[in-house]
Amino acid sequence: MYKRQEVGAEGVGLFRTEFFLLSNPSGMPDEEEQTRYYRKLAEGCSPHGVIFRTLDSGGDKLPCEQLRTPEPNPFLGWRGIRVSLSRPELFKQQLRAILRACADTPGCGIMFPMVSGYTEVVTAKHILQECREELERKNIPYARDLKVGIMIEVPSAAIMTDVLAREVDFFSIGTNDLTQYTIAVDRVNNRVANMFRPTHPAVIRIMDMTITAGERENIPTAICGEMAGDITLLPLLIGLGATSMSVGVHLVPIIRYAIRNLDYGQCRDMAQKALQAPNSRAIVDLSTALARKSYPALFE
């Protein structure tokens, strides 16, 4: 938290709440424990805020004992918002904790992961509203202006972003999973890992579709994943219209420096060319060329 302040990061763009759960192998922390933990984080990041991603258990993440279920293909199975919606009491516990923790810290938000369509979003929002009403009845202070967003990491959600943009306050593109699901490549499988390319033309077009849908409804789109911290691809992301990058603390000074040295008009023009490129190599070359021109010192 303090390191974040030292490097000039503006809040926490993605707090993975499941990491907190991993430290509790015997079960999910209760509402009070979660509230204390989230509040400390929110207060430490004030006034910029924290985006709390709800439990993203499954896939490549080890869940606590309460959620441990063997699956033949965990990346396409019970994970993300699917887990939360199937365990409404655990979900409500976490939502109430986040609402309470952010009562006195404006600028915070909540984000639902692994969304695949409209029904999941409205169902999750309905449960969140129930939590607000429960806290209201008990006269427990809670965040009344908490922003609600979703991760765009499944192609079906990306295709529906024109509809989903009317239901949320922001998007966050999870480039790692979006790439994996778009081009059907398991990034941890050595036999096909070389095919895992976030700059695949289909991935870039899906990102453009998502950002454009957000712009039409005046909602921002953040970028998460390894792609957000790649200085060679930063011109492309800025050109597509991404409004913020969620990166590791150690990358914040570098990314801030790079962004300050980019010309948005040039990035926009380059991104339009990239959207017409036939392959990943052409897209990388276009973005890298502008990156080297804009901040040569970072390539020395």
What annotation goes with each model-predicted range?
Residues 3-300:
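Conserved alpha/beta-domain cores
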